[in-house]
C-alpha cells in the first residue's frame, strides 16, 4: 500500500491551463507526487474534432499508465467533455474530469450561470447538461472562446487586444444578467485579473480546478491511496517545445521547471504509447 501511495497523480492538459489544477494540488495535497503532461504540440484542443480528442487522450493515458500513476486528472475541459466516459471504460485506474465538479460548484453559487469555454466544450453542451441535471431550475448560457487559449499560450495576457477579446466574449453573458461565471477551460484562470476588470463584483467566479482537487482528495481517501509520505519532485513533460513551456509556466510556478520532451507518434491506432526522448 505504501508503494501505491507513493505513486504519482497524473495530470494532463493541452498546455499551461492544467497548472491551475497543479497549484491547487500543491495546496490541498502537499504529500502527493505529480506527473504533469502538456500536449503542446497539438494545442489548442478546443478546435479539434471529438475523434481527434479521444485519440489524443488514449495515447496520453497509455503513456500515463506506463508511468505507474495511481490516478489521472483530466485538467482539460475539452477532454473531459468529449473523452472522459470512454476513457473510464477503457482504463482501470481512477480518472477524474473537471466538468462535474465545476457544475456542482456553479449551482451552489447562483441560478443564472454563464460558461466560457473552448468551441468544442461549448458545442458539446457538457456543462449545460451537467448543471441542469443537478438543478433543473438553473439557466445556462455558453460562449465559445476560440482565441483565449492561443493568447494565453503566447503569453499575451496583458495586451489591450486580449482585453477587447474578453469584452467581446463576456458581453453576451452580461446582457442576460448572469450571476455566476464558470471557467469552462482550465487556461482561463490565468485571465482572472482581466475578467475582474470587466465583470461587476456581484458575479461569482467558479474555477473547476479547485473542486476537482477536492474530488480527487476524497477519491484517494476512499481507495486508501492518499500519500502520507514526502512527495517527490514534480515531473513536467510536453509533446512540444520544452523551453517554451518552461518559460511560460515560470510566472505561475514561481520557478523555471525542468521539462522533458515526450514524443507522440502520429498514428491512426489508438493503442500507440508515448516514448520519452533521451
From Swiss-Prot:
GO MF assignments: glutamate racemase activity
Disulphide bond pairs: none
This protein's pathway: Cell wall biogenesis; peptidoglycan biosynthesis
Gene Ontology terms describing biological process: cell wall organization; peptidoglycan biosynthetic process; regulation of cell shape
The organism's place on the tree of life at top rank: Bacteria
Record's keyword annotation contains Isomerase: yes
Catalysed transformations (reactions): L-glutamate = D-glutamate
SUPFAM superfamilies reported in the protein's UniProt record: Aspartate/glutamate racemase (SSF53681)
Name of the top EC class for this enzyme: isomerase
E.C. code: 5.1.1.3
Binding site for substrate: 13-14, 45-46, 77-78, 186-187
Keyword Glycoprotein found: no
Active-site residue list: 76, 185
Swiss-Prot/TrEMBL keywords: Cell shape, Cell wall biogenesis/degradation, Isomerase, Peptidoglycan synthesis
Function: Provides the (R)-glutamate required for cell wall biosynthesis.
NCBIfam families named in the record: glut_race
Record PANTHER family: GLUTAMATE RACEMASE
Family: Belongs to the aspartate/glutamate racemases family.
UniProt name for this protein: Glutamate racemase
Organism expressing this protein natively: Gloeothece citriformis (strain PCC 7424)
Amino acid at each position: 500500500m505504501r508503494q501505491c501511495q507513493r505513486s504519482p497523480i497524473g495530470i494532463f492538459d493541452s498546455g499551461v491551463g492544467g497548472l491551475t489544477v497543479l497549484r491547487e494540488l500543491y495546496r490541498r495535497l502537499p504529500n502527493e507526487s505529480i506527473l504533469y503532461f502538456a500536449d503542446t504540440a497539438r494545442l489548442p484542443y478546443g478546435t479539434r474534432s471529438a475523434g481527434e480528442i479521444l485519440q489524443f487522450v488514449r495515447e496520453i493515458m497509455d503513456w500515463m499508465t506506463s508511468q505507474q500513476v495511481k490516478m489521472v486528472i483530466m485538467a482539460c475541459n475539452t477532454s473531459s467533455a468529449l473523452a472522459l466516459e470512454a476513457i473510464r471504460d477503457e482504463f482501470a485506474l481512477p480518472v477524474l474530469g473537471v466538468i462535474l465538479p465545476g457544475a456542482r460548484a456553479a449551482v451552489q453559487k447562483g441560478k443564472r450561470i454563464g460558461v466560457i469555454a473552448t468551441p468544442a466544450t461549448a458545442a458539446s453542451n457538457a456543462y449545460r447538461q451537467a448543471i441542469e441535471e443537478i438543478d433543473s431550475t438553473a439557466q445556462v448560457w455558453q460562449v465559445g472562446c476560440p482565441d483565449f487559449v492561443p493568447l494565453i499560450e503566447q503569453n499575451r495576457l496583458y495586451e489591450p487586444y486580449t482585453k477587447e477579446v474578453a469584452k467581446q466574449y463576456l458581453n453576451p453573458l452580461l446582457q442576460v444578467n448572469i450571476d455566476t461565471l464558470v471557467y469552462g477551460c482550465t487556461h482561463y484562470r490565468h485571465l482572472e485579473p482581466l475578467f475582474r476588470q470587466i465583470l461587476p463584483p456581484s458575479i461569482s467566479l467558479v474555477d473547476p480546478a479547485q473542486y476537482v482537487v477536492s474530488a480527487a482528495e476524497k477519491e484517494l481517501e476512499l481507495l486508501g491511496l492518499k500519500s502520507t509520505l514526502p512527495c517527490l519532485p514534480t515531473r513536467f513533460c510536453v509533446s512540444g517545445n520544452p523551453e517554451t513551456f518552461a518559460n511560460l509556466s515560470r510566472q505561475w510556478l514561481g520557478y523555471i521547471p525542468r521539462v522533458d520532451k515526450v514524443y507522440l507518434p502520429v498514428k491512426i491506432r489508438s493503442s500507440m504509447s508515448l516514448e520519452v526522448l533521451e
